[in-house]
């Protein structure tokens, strides 16, 4: 076991902080029912808070703490960090949902509705500011730079602790949470089509080369899952499961099968698939969420 998650699997992942912020805002998650997965989230939270010198908040159970306390911590972290456009958007959307809910059961926090309303305005304003700043910087250039950086890491073996589909998922998700995803959300339809077309070509080529086959050569899915160069259990499996916890077996069967390896593969996961089909399916599942 590595000393810390952030010095182990998380060392090569840029999207951990913004993902965690969204995770904290949303609270307990029934989609990660196993005890070791809940322990993973608690451990990750404690490490992240220690990194930003908020050790006083690292008491166990903060992910399940009263909503008012969690939102206070979310605001504090968002003030200290630059969560990125996707995280800001998702938190604002969650706050909008919270505004429509009845919070009378939180009698110990009578000011909770006002807190939610104020935070919604604050996060919405940050979203607008972020969008304006991003559109003034050249979205396509930044997207291209991030894409080149992430694929360089893939070629250099930074993600080799995961299976080939796991590496591809991580690459696509890193891009979705970064400048590439910003360009896909805020760019023109023509620009988005160009970006995603180039991404599909690169991801397909990398998958095919990594398994020493043509892009259209089909392999049994268990061959893909067994393609890591080192054991993929433990912390790496937990990290991948956490990264893909937004997926469902019905709506994102390929991504769900790749990330939730503690489950049986989804019915929608092709048993025979080529690099082209695997990359295309994951890209569609991931970026259809991105553009929603």
From Swiss-Prot:
<protein>
    <recommendedName>
        <fullName>Uncharacterized protein YjcZ</fullName>
    </recommendedName>
</protein>
<dbReference type="GO" id="GO:1900231">
    <property type="term" value="P:regulation of single-species biofilm formation on inanimate substrate"/>
</dbReference>
<dbReference type="InterPro" id="IPR025599">
    <property type="entry name" value="YjcZ"/>
</dbReference>
<dbReference type="Pfam" id="PF13990">
    <property type="entry name" value="YjcZ"/>
</dbReference>
